[in-house]
């Protein structure tokens, strides 16, 4: 690519999926520029590194670019996209640029409906502890690195593979993980679950003949597609039929302790402490262990990488103790969960880490279509908390859908009779609503994929 492409321009450079790729390309010596609607921590960091960042969108911003990279959030009538097409400058999706990056390295792609960001982060941590200095592009900020992307000197590149728009079918990794397959983003697959599952098969089949698929056999849908995958496969799970499995799993002080069993001709066993709560994170760690072993990491490096894992932004991110208005304090945690399956897993992890504590959930639904398609599943998981604050749906560009909004969810939960929800229409009012509702000793979880991510910081600021 480098002999023809010198200047790469990103439309929407501040997006979590775009900034990491831009950062790595800048580190490789390309001229990188980009535009975004607003200034923020990400655009400030890119500008400080020497990336030229424009605000707003204008046709002149693509001057001199050899290629323009867009995300799915960028519309076809964006003035920069129109100008690029008029000038015959190639316009490509971010996944195609990620695929080009993988040509520089040995690509490791992490796919699945849930757990991609955490699993990618755990894998990067394991490879880093092994001295393999991986390049990584992650959908959240890796706490230890202070960023969501890094250009390493090693041969491996670890990145998330996004099924939401089927763009993972652009990638050609040498190793690929599938954590699970659930019904989400079904518009992309004509509302056919069979098409969604086949897309994961097609993704795995894009690996070379020497590639390796790492599959979670605890997930029934992953188990089902396994027979369609002709590449070498390593399985993992809590089930002892897997090639790599965990036994003696127990929670302690916000961590998970377990023994790892590896079937590799002989049986290898070793103890492990994962610095994350939840059985779902044990599964995520097992896939990172499988990748680590495949890449030559020692058991000691794997143990170090997982026991010292410092977390990733908005994935069970702890904000510590916050002053409660009734005296004492409550524990504040923030999480990106926005699908009922991942919400249930996170809330189960909270219950395990903080037994016998009242659980207050402040949830912002994400997308009207998801709320409509999974309405009863949302009602079920929301009804399992002790106290509930519910905001209006974060639209993410969608038009409202009747009976698939925040008020409808609140009514349905109320009818169930297990918890009395408080509807907070404007997310800007959520920080004060949390302080009004939280009691001494509570565990408060803010959750969702939209603007709720700004709420915990405002809660701590208001509490003083």
UniProtKB/Swiss-Prot annotation:
Alphabetical UniProt keywords? ATP-binding, Cell cycle, Cell division, Cell shape, Cell wall biogenesis/degradation, Cytoplasm, Ligase, Nucleotide-binding, Peptidoglycan synthesis
Q: Which gene encodes it?
A: murC
A single Gene Ontology CC term: cytoplasm
Please name the pathway. Answer: Cell wall biogenesis; peptidoglycan biosynthesis
**Functional note:** Cell wall formation.
List the catalysed reactions: UDP-N-acetyl-alpha-D-muramate + L-alanine + ATP = UDP-N-acetyl-alpha-D-muramoyl-L-alanine + ADP + phosphate + H(+)
Q: Where in the cell is it found?
A: Cytoplasm
Which InterPro entries does this chain map to? Mur-like_cat_sf, Mur_ligase_C, Mur_ligase_C_dom_sf, Mur_ligase_cen, Mur_ligase_N, MurCDEF_pg_biosynth, UDP-N-AcMur_Ala_ligase_MurC
**Species per Swiss-Prot/TrEMBL record:** Chromobacterium violaceum (strain ATCC 12472 / DSM 30191 / JCM 1249 / CCUG 213 / NBRC 12614 / NCIMB 9131 / NCTC 9757 / MK)
Q: What is this protein called?
A: UDP-N-acetylmuramate--L-alanine ligase
- Write the signal peptide boundaries: none
EC numbers for this chain: 6.3.2.8
SUPFAM superfamilies linked: MurCD N-terminal domain, MurD-like peptide ligases, catalytic domain, MurD-like peptide ligases, peptide-binding domain
Q: What class of enzyme is it?
A: ligase
Give the similarity note: Belongs to the MurCDEF family.
Q: Molecular function terms in GO for this entry?
A: ATP binding; UDP-N-acetylmuramate-L-alanine ligase activity
What GO terms in the biological process aspect are recorded for it? cell division; cell wall organization; peptidoglycan biosynthetic process; regulation of cell shape
Q: Which annotated residues bind ATP?
A: 112-118
Q: Which Gene3D superfamilies match?
A: Mur ligase, C-terminal domain, Mur-like, catalytic domain, NAD(P)-binding Rossmann-like Domain
